[in-house]
């Protein structure tokens, strides 16, 4: 059964555009060897990290969404762990959206606005 996955990884900020494309193509080809479906790659570009990672304060973010059996996750993460260009990665299994409507929608009661009395100016 195919599951949906989302992987975000961060590359070293010192990589050139050509090197970034080589890294992206390397991992894209890696996933294609595992016959994943609906592979989408988005390069977010260089962004500031929330905290320093391996002494880097910036990183090049890349997002990959795909559908696969699940046997590709561990080898892909191992390849990224061994790479010097990848400073952080994370893979998430994305839950599919449920298209069913609820059986009954409870009625929501909205309280009526309460009018507050206007203050009377104090006489001196």
Curated annotation (Swiss-Prot):
GO terms for cellular component: cytoplasm; ribonucleoprotein complex; ribosome. One of its GO terms (biological process) is translation. It comes from the Bacteria. InterPro entries: Ribosomal_bS6, Ribosomal_bS6_CS, Ribosomal_bS6_sf, Ribosomal_S6_plastid/chlpt, Transl_elong_EF1B/ribsomal_bS6. CDD domains: bS6_chloro_cyano. The keyword Metal-binding does not apply. It holds the Pfam family Ribosomal_S6. Keywords: Ribonucleoprotein, Ribosomal protein, RNA-binding, rRNA-binding. One of its GO terms (molecular function) is small ribosomal subunit rRNA binding. The keyword Nucleotidyltransferase does not apply. Belongs to the bacterial ribosomal protein bS6 family. PANTHER family: MITOCHONDRIAL 28S RIBOSOMAL PROTEIN S6, SMALL RIBOSOMAL SUBUNIT PROTEIN BS6M. Binds together with bS18 to 16S ribosomal RNA. This is Small ribosomal subunit protein bS6. It comes from Rippkaea orientalis (strain PCC 8801 / RF-1) (Cyanothece sp. (strain PCC 8801)).
């Amino acid at each position: 059964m195919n599951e949906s996955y989302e992987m975000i990884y961060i590359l070293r900020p010192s990589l050139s555009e050509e090197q970034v494309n080589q890294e992206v193509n390397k991992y894209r080809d890696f996933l294609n060897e595992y016959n994943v479906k609906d592979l989408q790659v988005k390069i977010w570009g260089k962004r500031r990290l929330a905290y320093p990672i391996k002494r880097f304060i910036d990183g090049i973010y890349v997002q990959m969404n795909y559908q696969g059996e699940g046997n590709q996750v561990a080898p892909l993460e191992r390849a990224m762990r061994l790479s010097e260009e990848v400073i952080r990665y994370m893979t998430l299994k994305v839950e599919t959206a449920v298209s069913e409507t609820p059986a009954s929608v409870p009625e929501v009661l909205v309280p009526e606005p309460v009018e507050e009395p206007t203050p009377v100016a104090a006489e001196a």
